[in-house]
Amino acid sequence: MSLINTQVQPFKAQAFHNGKFVEVTEASLKGKWSVLIFMPAAFTFNCPTEIEDAADHYAEFQKAGAEVYIVTTDTHFSHKVWHETSPAVGKAQFPLVGDPTHALTNAFGVHIPEAGLALRGTFVIDPSGTIKTMEVHDNAIARDVAETLRKLKAAQYVASHPSEVCPAKWKEGEKTLAPSIDLVGKI
């Protein structure tokens, strides 16, 4: 089932962020763009590489007015230790959200019940709390966060230019398309 153009459902979770335990709710996502990046579990193999990639691009997300949230089915306590012990995860300046009850992973359709883990899911959410992009895939395939950033910027662009669309491989500053009858069959 697609979650595109649906509202994020109410939730409450604990996260490790900037050396503290903090609460994250659906209200935390409102008023700014948000990127939720679901991962299977702390202390695994691909997950730290993705967190490091997100950390390397974090300034760009912030410049775009977006916050990044990493979500696993672990507790916020595990995230604290993971942040303190993994050189890659230690670079994270964004919230590491715990979902031990699987409420978030179920709400976003990425829970693997038989494993108690999450699939690799990425969701871009607009400031009103509406899901604008989603991508879910096998846990053996890590994501390229630069592509997530590109999708965020495309979602932001079409939100502020509703009569235009971003074509394949579109990057910020490049030409978009204005759908019209005159374009039909000409692309």
What residue ranges belong to the model's regions?
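Chalcogenol-based redox active-site neighborhoods
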Residues: 1-187
